[in-house]
């Protein structure tokens, strides 16, 4: 990859920073504990931010896409991610567990129905939750759609070299020549190792690859995030775990489930030059869900921090706010 070029900050498009009014650790089972937080209006319309990865975790930046005077904003970290414990753990960590965890959090917070806001893997989990619990959902805002199909996983592991050959070459050549015939299997084996001298170099290589391909014009600070070893290990290990198991979803299951949620308001925001999650997937979802609003951002890739993506997500949430306020 050539030297990263700084893009204008998208922060000016967001709402002011707000601090959590409440937070906690929710026991999910005998092994996993979920970190959660709530900010904004405690009596407001509930909205939950569903982070990507899987394994990505929630960040303070993710509180700022919504008007804190209107929304009761919930952020949380999925199993093995962020401040949930144990970090980077893939035991009892499947899509079905994550759907059940989200429902457990809703019940814990006393929320009847909420808006789902998720991008990338967050869109996958939002759709999986909504199709399992449509009566608990007020609406959806999705970004950079990923449906966890084998074709999408193969694209991530191999196809992105068509656009980012330098980044893919570094990713592949991290492995010895004998292991390059099956990148996913051999990365998964290394990332699953309990030995830090084995799993950490693999995690850094995986995270550098994904970061390099995430934005139309990469930002230097985004490419530096792999300096955080715990975050790099969580996202690499958990992504590889999900990918090797096809996302714990039958191919086509999420699209087939759209019939159960077509009555819900939804906006799909997609970067035209998203290489991580190419527009063909969002297009398929939009065709299966003609009632949804489909917005293609002409000058953006995958990253939520790209100004065009940020702008359209804020607009989408504001439209959802107007819809709920008019009820």
Which residue stretches match the model-derived regions?
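Conserved acidic catalytic loop of the alpha/beta-hydrolase fold
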Residues: 96-114
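Short beta-strand/loop motif that positions the catalytic acidic residue
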Residues: 261-262, 268-270
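Conserved alpha/beta-hydrolase "acid-adjacent" motif
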Residues: 250, 275-281
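A catalytic-pocket lid/entrance helix-loop region that shapes and gates access to the active site
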Residues: 137-187
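Conserved HGGG/HGGXW glycine-rich cap/lid loop of the alpha/beta-hydrolase fold
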Residues: 27-86
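Catalytic active-site module of serine/aspartate enzymes centered on a nucleophile-bearing elbow/loop
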Residues: 292-327
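N-terminal cap/lid segment of alpha/beta-hydrolase-fold proteins
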Residues: 11-34, 239
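Conserved hydrolase catalytic core segment
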Residues: 112-154
């Amino acid at each position: 990859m050539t030297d990263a070029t700084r893009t204008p900050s998208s922060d000016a498009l967001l709402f002011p920073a707000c601090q959590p009014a409440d937070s906690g650790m929710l026991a999910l089972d005998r092994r996993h504990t979920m970190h959660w937080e709530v900010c904004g209006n405690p009596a407001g319309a509930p909205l939950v931010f569903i982070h990507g990865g899987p394994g990505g975790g929630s960040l303070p930046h993710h509180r700022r896409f919504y008007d804190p005077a209107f929304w009761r904003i919930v952020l949380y970290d999925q199993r093995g991610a962020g401040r949930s414990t144990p970090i980077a753990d893939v035991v009892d960590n499947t899509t079905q567990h994550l759907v059940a965890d989200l429902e457990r959090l809703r019940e814990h917070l006393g929320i009847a129905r909420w808006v789902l806001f998720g991008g990338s893997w967050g869109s996958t989990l939002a759709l999986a939750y909504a199709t399992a619990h449509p009566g608990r959902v007020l609406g959806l805002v999705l970004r950079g759609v990923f449906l966890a199909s084998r074709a999408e996983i193969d694209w991530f592991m191999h196809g992105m070299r068509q656009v980012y050959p330098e980044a893919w070459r570094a990713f592949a050549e991290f492995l010895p020549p004998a292991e390059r015939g099956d990148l996913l299997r051999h990365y998964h084996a290394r990332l699953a190792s309990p030995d830090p001298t084995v799993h950490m170099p693999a995690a850094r290589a995986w995270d550098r690859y994904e970061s390099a391909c995430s934005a139309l014009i990469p930002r230097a600070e985004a490419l530096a995030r792999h300096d955080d070893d715990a975050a790099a290990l969580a996202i690499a290990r958990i992504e590889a775990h999900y990918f090797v198991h096809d996302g714990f979803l039958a191919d086509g299951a999420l699209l087939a489930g759209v019939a159960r949620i077509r009555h819900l308001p939804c906006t799909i925001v997609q970067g035209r030059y998203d290489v991580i999650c190419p527009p063909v997937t969002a297009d398929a979802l939009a065709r299966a869900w003609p009632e949804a609003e489909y917005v293609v951002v002409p000058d953006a890739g995958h990253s939520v921090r790209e100004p065009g993506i940020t702008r359209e997500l804020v607009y989408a949430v504001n439209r959802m706010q107007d819809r709920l306020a008019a009820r």
